[in-house]
Amino acid sequence: MEPAPGLVEQPKCLEAGSPEPEPAPWQALPVLSEKQSGDVELVLAYAAPVLDKRQTSRLLKEVSALHPLPAQPHLKRVRPSRDAGSPHALEMLLCLAGPASGPRSLAELLPRPAVDPRGLGQPFLVPVPARPPLTRGQFEEARAHWPTSFHEDKQVTSALAGRLFSTQERAAMQSHMERAVWAARRAAARGLRAVGAVVVDPASDRVLATGHDCSCADNPLLHAVMVCVDLVARGQGRGTYDFRPFPACSFAPAAAPQAVRAGAVRKLDADEDGLPYLCTGYDLYVTREPCAMCAMALVHARILRVFYGAPSPDGALGTRFRIHARPDLNHRFQVFRGVLEEQCRWLDPDT
């Protein structure tokens, strides 16, 4: 029977009065975009030794005017010599080499009268980072090739180091993923795929929907994420499917998310009737990495964050595609992997 409004079925391990679980040895690691997580891309450039340091300021001004680097503002034009025994102390970046790179003279690279090359030595080729580094790891790799500026995202650095969430936040995250694990086990007991999911309003830490995989031959689309999205819709007076045969799938009437209550939801973040999208400002906890269909459903629902336990061969967030971070989509969301990963892996042998 469908739960009464506001009453989400409570797993026994999470009932009131039970001791607060101690955070387990797991890490919620960010799933970054391909640009953030990829290796540093290198391109060839021409540099030259500065033989007369007194000419450095003039040369820097003239070379920068002749060969500006608008697409590489992160590259510093001068670096100390890498060779401790070198007779010159500085080296200057002249210009990118382009596809037809090869030995070039100063006269070819720095024609007069644009540049007076006095004080420079013979040019040489050097690999330099093509794009600005986005993480500290990329920065360390980039500056090993050529000095590079770096505007650090402290949140990303903290997340990669496992320091983004407090002990209290980790305890709440563990509790929500334990609920998802409980739902997955209920699904397995019914002969369904052992995948569970939970939608939470992080402003109040209130559970809005608990669901599990309900897919079958008649409806192969009812993955756990799709079930939860529909249950959130049911809590908002909408929804399409009848989940009364599945008592572990439950919902609570949704209060407006904090962003909506504060009037911070843009027109683009509302549907045609002016209401916010289904999951605006909400978090999803799911035991298994969502597939492409579910990931796109989360884009359309405007989810805020996704926490998944175990990766999936057909996952569309961390394993493939990184749908949540695609710049060509009109919504992006944060994704973290690894919450109770071992427990989630045990649920489904395919993870």
From Swiss-Prot:
Q: Name one Pfam family in it.
A: dCMP_cyt_deam_1
Residue numbers carrying N-acetylmethionine: 1
Q: Which cofactor does it need?
A: Zn(2+)
| Record GO biological process | tRNA processing
- Disordered: where is this region? 1-26
Annotated Zn(2+) binding sites? 223, 291, 294
Q: Which residues form the CMP/dCMP-type deaminase domain?
A: 171-336
Signal sequence, start to end: none
Concerning SUPFAM superfamilies, the annotation shows: Cytidine deaminase-like
Q: Name one GO cellular component term.
A: nucleus
Keywords, alphabetical: Acetylation, Disease variant, Intellectual disability, Metal-binding, tRNA processing, Zinc
One GO MF term on file is: catalytic activity
Q: Which PANTHER family does this one have?
A: CYTOSINE DEAMINASE FAMILY MEMBER, INACTIVE TRNA-SPECIFIC ADENOSINE DEAMINASE-LIKE PROTEIN 3-RELATED
Report the disease annotation for this entry: Neurodevelopmental disorder with brain abnormalities, poor growth, and dysmorphic facies: An autosomal recessive disorder characterized by global developmental delay, impaired intellectual development, and speech delay apparent from infancy or early childhood. Most patients have dysmorphic facial features, and white matter abnormalities on brain imaging. More variable features may include teeth anomalies, distal joint contractures, spasticity, peripheral neuropathy, and behavioral problems.
Q: Which family does it belong to?
A: Belongs to the cytidine and deoxycytidylate deaminase family. ADAT3 subfamily.
* Name used for this protein in its record: Probable inactive tRNA-specific adenosine deaminase-like protein 3
- Gene encoding this chain? ADAT3
